[in-house]
């Protein structure tokens, strides 16, 4: 739609998305991470990187995907936390906008299916509510869809699913940082053999991730000072 030139900087969708990702960090509270215990942290912080790496390798070795940037963006999207991770990783590996759009589109399709199918399947096999919630939190992509799917099972499943996904969201920054290093030093390695400097990695690193971590630290500190009533 038509809008005057002076307002164009304020209607760039990219900045709204990045601002939303910074605000997403406000929900990652460290006291809740500790409260869920070792099993939940294991699912989010150990299984997720394994899935990310194995998905990327599968895309390169088996599917023979010609674009490594598309491959890693889809891998992060499907393994970490959906569009949020895709946006961060796409910035780190300098993926094309079309590749990011495709990754997010695939995520939305599978999320819509899993949001309905997983609760039904979990009920069918009789899995305990807490375990079902953890499974949903670790596999369904977007945070809102995780909450909706968990609510289908019950209040305990909702709480566990949302907490596992919240813990998983911490890996947005870690994934972006690791991808920035990998693509700068391995995928786009210089022909003259010269080492990639720290500035190149810094330029690749999506700066809104710092805001994400900052929001998490600030809100976690406030929550800790207020107590359990927050």
Model regions and ranges:
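Entry/N-cap segments of selected transmembrane alpha helices
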Residues: 19, 24-56, 101-113, 230
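Transmembrane alpha-helices that form the ion-translocation and gating core
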Residues: 43-75, 109, 113-127, 222-227
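Juxtamembrane and boundary regions of transmembrane helices in multi-pass small-molecule transporters
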Residues: 57-64, 114-139, 164-195
């Amino acid at each position: 739609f038509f809008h005057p030139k002076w307002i164009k900087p304020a209607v760039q969708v990219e900045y709204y998305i990045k601002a939303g990702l910074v605000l997403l960090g406000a929900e990652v509270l460290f006291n809740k991470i500790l409260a869920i215990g070792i099993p939940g942290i294991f699912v989010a912080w150990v299984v997720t990187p394994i899935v990310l790496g194995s998905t990327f390798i599968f895309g390169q070795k088996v599917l023979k995907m010609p674009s490594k940037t598309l491959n890693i963006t889809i891998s992060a999207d499907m393994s970490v936390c959906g569009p949020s991770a895709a946006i961060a990783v796409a910035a780190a590996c300098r993926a094309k906008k079309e590749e990011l759009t495709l990754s997010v589109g695939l995520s939305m399709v599978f999320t819509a299916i899993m949001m309905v199918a997983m609760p039904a399947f979990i009920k069918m096999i009789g899995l305990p509510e807490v375990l079902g919630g953890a499974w949903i939190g670790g596999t369904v992509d977007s945070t809102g869809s995780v909450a909706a799917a968990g609510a289908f099972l019950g209040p305990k499943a909702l709480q566990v699913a949302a907490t596992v996904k919240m813990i998983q969201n911490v890996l947005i920054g870690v994934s972006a940082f690791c991808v920035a290093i990998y693509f700068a030093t391995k995928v786009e390695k210089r022909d003259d053999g010269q080492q990639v400097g720290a500035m190149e990695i810094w330029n690749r690193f999506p700066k809104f991730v710092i805001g994400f971590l900052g929001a998490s630290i600030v809100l976690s500190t406030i929550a800790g000072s207020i107590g359990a009533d927050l």
